[in-house]
Each structure stands twice: as C-alpha cells, then as structure tokens.
Amino acid sequence: MQQQALSTKQFDAVCLQAASLSDEIEAGRRLPAEFARQLAAQGMFSMFVPRDLGGHELSPVDGMARLEKLAQYDAASAWVCMIGATAALGSAFIKADIAQPMFAAENRITCGIFAPNGRGYRDGDDYVVSGRWAWASGSANADYIGLGCLLTENPDDDPKTAEMRLVMAPRELIQFHDTWHTLGLKGTSSGDVELSQARIPVAHSYAIGKDLPWHDGPLYQMPYFAFLAAGVGAVALGNARAAIEDFKRFVGVKKGAGERRTLAEKSGVQSQLAQAEVTLRATRLLYRDTLAGIWQDVCAGVEMTPEKRADLRLVSTHAVRQSVAVVRIIHDLAGGTSVYLSSPIQRRLRDAETMTQHMIASASTYELVGRVMLGGYHETMQL
C-alpha cells in the first residue's frame, strides 16, 4: 500500500520538531529513536522508493528541495534522511517481494555506505561477508544498512575477479562501534559498523551501475553517485541558508565592544552579508537548474553520458564548497559570539566543514570532472 503523501503542513511540523530537538540531537550524537520513526512515518526515508512498494517515488527536484528545507532547521536530521533516502534507491534493484518489507514497511529506516570495504564469497544462496565501514550515517536507528563489498564466487578466487555489490544487512547481524566523535554533523550517528562472517542472501544484494532495475520509472535511471552528491549539495545549501538567517536575527542588536552602532549599521557587515547572499543564491540556482535539466533528460529517455553525470557531480560539489565559504563569512561577521558551543552559527560552520570531507563532495571531484571533460572517462569512475 502506498504511503500517504507528506503534506506541507505535516512537513513544516517535522521541520519545527527537528529545530526543537537540535540541541538534544547534537548532545546525543544521534536522532532520538522516536523522532527518527516520526521522520520515517512522514516518508523522509521512502521519498525515492517506488510507489509500487508503498514509497513516494518523488522526483529528484522535489526530494532534494525537502532535504534542503529540513537542513535549515537541523542539518544532522537532514543528513540522516538524505543518506537513508538515497540508499533506498536500491529498492528498485532488489526483487519487489524482498524489497517491500526491507525498504517500505511501516516506519522503515535504511541507510547505506557504498565504499567497498567488505570482502566475501558466495556459499549457496548466501554471501559470507566480513568488513568494517566508517561514516555509517543514521545507523543508530537503521533497520537495514546497505554495505559495499567486493564479492567472489569462491573463497579462494583471485580478488581481481570480485564484483562490487551492496548487501543489505539487517541490524541484528551488525556490530556497531562508537567512533563518531567529530567536528560537525555530530547528531548523525555516523560511527563504524562491522560484519564478521555474516550470511547475507544473494537476493538481498545489488550492483550499482550494473544491475537493471525491475521498476521502469525514470527515477531509477538517475546516476547513483551523482544522485548522492546532489543530496549532499541540498543539505549544504539548506545549512548555509540557515546561517545567513541566524545572523540576520541577531545582527540588529549586537554591538562590538565599546561601540554604539550595531553590526547591522556597519557598511562592511552590510557588504559582506550581501556578497554571501548572492553567492549562495547563484550557487543554488546553478545547482537546481542543473538537477532539473538532468531530470528532464532522464524523463525524456536521453542517455546519461559520462559528461552529464560528471556535470551533476560538479555542480553538487560546487554547492557544498561554496556553501561552506558562505558560512565562513557569516561566522566571521558574527565575531566573538560565534566561538561558543551554544552558538547556532558555530554549529552551522562545523556541520558545513564536515560535509566537505565526505568523499562524494571532496575537492578530488574537480580532478575527476576535469578528466572527463578532457576525454579521460573510464568505467571505474564513480559518476
């Protein structure tokens, strides 16, 4: 049965709740379990699950807009939903009768890590898998976690013959390590997870970029890695917007030491704020225009060439890295107020800086895209 569509009123209420819980989320280094299930009930983890399974099958444009807005209220909540929702694209690549309870059961939460840190081999109808993965965002509340693995047919096969697949591991098979003590995105429970000789049914796995979806909707023709990058970009843009709005709320009353004028009355502050604003708006426009163009092409059946996939990776990384530049300006303008852990602007900066360290939005993306622009594409590129 298809989940009820999330109304604007319901979504606004979820956003306000995220804001009210932001300090608790930060201190606890995870989303409270009850709140995570509320997000799931409102469809934040099933945005990109096929309607045939009970998901919402939102367009990338609509889904990323929701993540961007949620990030304005609490970046950690948006990050967890982003990782979970993009990981749930796998629901269209696993047989429907298996995927439905895995991805679309009531209040289901999933997350995923595509880094192929697992090793395993086939034993009958199962893969036997061991490995350890970092950055397992949302793992504190996840029912299933997609884990990247290099898998062979036999234990002694040459590793060069291994196939990269994501295995959907149920929570009860996973060992959780409390490693997420970080600069930012503290509330995302992105600690390490581990499997040790775990048996995962072959039917509970899929290969990104190789397996064909059982669902013929255009959403499942979107390039996975570029789609993930777009998700990170959406969260970064929302976080940067919130930093500007946070600053505008207090700049009219704050005065520097020994000064009569408020920060809002200073021409230098006015100029830098305007520059931050136009930087963010221009970056967001490029991001949304490119995402909408890619989606339009996918819906029209246009081939997703390496150049098109690289373009979405490029503008998404640009969104992340320009967003942190904007937040740095705001943090600097806020002065001494922003050094305190209680400062929302400081949290925005710490969260923004941490987003830049995710490999999908790192500076190495520019090298990757430049290589494609110069005709150097090869199939192992994560586009």
Predicted regions and their residues:
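Internal helix-loop-helix
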Residues: A41-F103
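Glycine-rich beta->alpha junctions and the first turn(s) of the following alpha-helix
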Residues: L183-L280
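DPxDG-like acidic metal-binding loop motif
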Residues: R132-L173
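Glycine-rich phosphate/cofactor-binding loops in nucleotide/flavin-utilizing enzymes
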Residues: A334-L383
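Active-site glycine-rich loop that binds ribose-phosphate moieties when present
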Residues: G112-I113, C149, A169-T182
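C-terminal helix-coil-helix/basic helical segment that borders enzyme active sites and/or dimer interfaces
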Residues: A19, D23-E26, R281-H318, R328-V339
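Well-ordered mid-protein domain cores that form the structural environment of catalytic cofactors
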Residues: A88-D125
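Generic structural signal for well-ordered, non-transmembrane alpha-helical segments
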Residues: G238, A274-R281, R313, T317-V324, ...
